[in-house]
């Protein structure tokens, strides 16, 4: 993405605006970083990295370095202009204002940035508030300055000059230690950070981003630099897929908006569009993504009409038909004056002008490409027509399910399989997808019949990564799930119509169980993704061990889910205890299954989330796709094989 020209002199103490004081961040951290688990911890990293990215985006600096230090703290260093070091109108050093006052930053006025991705400047102060300590080091105007904060953002030193530097050298380095009294974990994950900064490197093609982990001596450094930017990003997304087209690249500028699009078709059956605004991922899309989809649909339908692939009596194909098998990256720079997000987060762009700008640029250039590449274009239209036929079959299936018009075959699918809940309240009901008939029987007996439904999975679950929609609808197990959930499938899926609040996958704690989990998650990811994104899909966690001692009424019973918990039970029970290793769910009776795995008061559920769409896309493609080599490599790198089954995955 081309960089905006900005006057370096505009980024000074007067450019820092203050909207409100920093209040209650420590009391309600979830309002600012989403959560206090590992996701919230890494959100702190993104806030500081995004500020460094804003500097690079504005044309200042060619490298950003992220370092996980030996003591567990984390540093982000950029080559930007360096934060202003003078006094602010509030009577404090400007740096102190930036790190202690919420919404203090250079992104509200018209001088500091024309485009920015940081959360309107709140990031630095929020990170400071949620840290045990934070240090900022600034290189600017031939000098090096430093200030330290402790105990949730309290300045313990003033901004002081600690050295000199060449006048040509500028930048900011922020180091912080997350507060263990706030976060459930303070362990930074190397791979999580690497994937995120890799994404930023794709979008900043003139900038190198590095990550170093000083906690270990080997395999502790990665560097990312991509000369072709978003084109390289799309190639990365499709790396483990069979592609049908070269990477198409379109760019343009209008009304101060800069647009870049890279897209490529593969032989898969789902689409994967990643959109960004000012280098920040907009996972819920928005007006810019709508413009892209509209442009693709219009250009393709117009071409199909002109070439006779769609006859006069035929209806236009829908956008989802043309997006089947499409991987695309849309990156747009929006001027600060036009930047609007929907809601409190940056997940969805609301800027009205973005839609026509993207639509116009992509429509014109895609139309030209189609006319110049007739054979390829015709193949894409034929592929879309097949997608339409599959979509209409899926819609028919959903309508029949919703209206209760199941065929004899479909009624037979559910007959003797689904044990429904008594309640008809979709906001409270739970559906357990249970591996095998024996476990299904125990689950039926042990459940709370008021709100828990049981669907045993008897046959083989289809690998939907390798199947088209017609094959999916022919698979008995998948078809039964579609009818039971009741919200359609594929492009026609509507999460609001789901019959259950929780879809819970319950399998044995062995390799077969893990395989079934993976097959089901692949199906939900590809064909009911909104169900996952809305947090409705869970994995049940049955215990691995049962330890008992004594008999009759004096019998003591306890369960362990991990080997460390087992060792604790050994110490607690002492000699004379009996240990049972559960090989499968069927070994538990109904009461045990209820107590350990189904009772909302005592069970443990893992909610399935998609934190990084690009990473999830690659993982599904590698593990479930056609290419064996990358799957074998991933297993060798990530799975430890032992002689004794451990139940750890």
Feature-to-residue mapping (PLM):
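Conserved short strand/loop->alpha-helix "switch" segment adjacent to the catalytic nucleotide/phosphoryl-transfer site
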Residues: 27-46
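C-terminal interaction appendages of subunits in large macromolecular complexes
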Residues: 389-413, 425-430, 441, 445-447, ...
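Residues immediately C-terminal
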Residues: 54-55, 82-83, 511-512
């Amino acid at each position: 993405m081309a960089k905006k020209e900005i006057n370096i002199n505009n980024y000074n103490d007067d450019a820092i605006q203050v909207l409100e004081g920093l209040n209650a961040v420590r009391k309600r951290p979830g309002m600012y970083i989403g959560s206090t688990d590992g996701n919230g911890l890494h959100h702190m990293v993104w806030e500081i990295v995004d500020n460094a990215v804003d500097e690079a985006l504005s044309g200042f600096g060619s490298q950003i370095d992220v370092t996980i230090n030996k003591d567990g703290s984390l540093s982000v260093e950029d080559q930007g202009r360096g934060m202003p070091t003078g006094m602010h109108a509030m009577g404090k050093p400007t740096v102190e204002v930036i790190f202690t006052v919420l919404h203090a930053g250079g992104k509200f006025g018209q001088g500091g940035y024309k485009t920015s991705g940081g959360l309107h400047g709140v990031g630095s102060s929020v990170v400071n508030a949620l840290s045990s300590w934070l240090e900022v080091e600034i290189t600017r105007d031939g000098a090096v300055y430093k200030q330290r904060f402790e105990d949730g953002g309290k300045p313990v030193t003033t901004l002081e000059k600690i050295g000199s530097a060449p006048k040509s050298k500028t930048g900011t380095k922020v180091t912080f230690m997350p507060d263990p009294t706030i976060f459930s974990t303070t362990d930074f994950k190397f791979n999580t950070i690497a994937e995120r900064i890799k994404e930023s490197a794709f979008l900043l093609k003139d900038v190198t981003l590095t990550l170093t982990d000083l906690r270990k001596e080997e395999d502790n450094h990665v560097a990312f630099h991509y000369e072709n930017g978003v084109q390289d990003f799309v190639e990365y997304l499709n790396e483990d897929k069979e592609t049908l087209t070269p990477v198409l690249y379109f760019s343009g500028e209008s009304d101060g908006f800069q647009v870049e699009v890279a897209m490529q078709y593969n032989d898969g059956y789902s689409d994967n569009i990643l959109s960004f605004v000012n280098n920040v991922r907009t996972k819920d899309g928005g007006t810019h993504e709508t413009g892209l989809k509209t442009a693709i649909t219009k250009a393709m339908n117009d071409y199909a009409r002109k070439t006779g692939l769609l006859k006069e009596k035929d209806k236009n194909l829908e956008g989802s038909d043309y997006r089947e098998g499409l991987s695309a990256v849309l990156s747009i720079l929006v001027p600060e004056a036009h930047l609007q997000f929907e809601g409190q987060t940056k997940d969805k762009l609301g800027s009205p002008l973005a839609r026509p700008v993207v639509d116009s640029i992509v429509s014109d250039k895609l139309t030209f490409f189609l006319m110049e590449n007739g054979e390829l274009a015709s193949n894409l239209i034929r592929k879309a027509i097949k997608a339409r036929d599959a979509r209409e079959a899926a819609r028919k299936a959903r309508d029949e399910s919703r209206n209760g018009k199941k065929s004899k075959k479909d009624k037979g699918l559910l007959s003797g399989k689904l044990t429904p809940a008594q309640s008809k309240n979709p906001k409270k009901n739970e559906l357990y997808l249970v591996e095998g008939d024996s476990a299904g029987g125990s689950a039926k007996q042990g459940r709370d019949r008021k709100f828990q439904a049981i669907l045993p999975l008897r046959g083989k679950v289809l690998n939907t990564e390798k199947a088209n929609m017609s094959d999916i609808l022919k698979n008995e197990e998948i078809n039964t799930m579609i009818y039971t959930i009741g919200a359609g499938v594929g492009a026609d899926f509507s999460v609001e119509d789901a019959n259950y609040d929780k879809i819970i996958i319950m399998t044995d704690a062995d390799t077969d169980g893990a395989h079934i989990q993976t097959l089901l998650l692949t199906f939900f990811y590809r064909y009911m993704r909104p169900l996952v994104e809305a947090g409705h899909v869970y994995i049940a966690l049955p215990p691995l061990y049962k330890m008992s001692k004594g008999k009759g009424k004096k019998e003591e019973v306890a369960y362990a889910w991990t080997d460390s918990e087992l060792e604790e039970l050994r110490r607690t029970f002492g000699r004379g205890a009996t240990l049972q290793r559960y090989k499968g769910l069927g070994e538990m009776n109904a009461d045990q299954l209820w107590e350990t795995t189904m009772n909302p008061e005592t069970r443990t559920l893992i909610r399935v989330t998609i934190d990084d769409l690009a990473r999830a896309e690659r993982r599904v493609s590698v593990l479930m796709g056609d290419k064996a080599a990358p799957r074998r490599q991933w297993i060798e790198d990530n799975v430890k094989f032992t002689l004794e089954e451990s139940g750890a995955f």
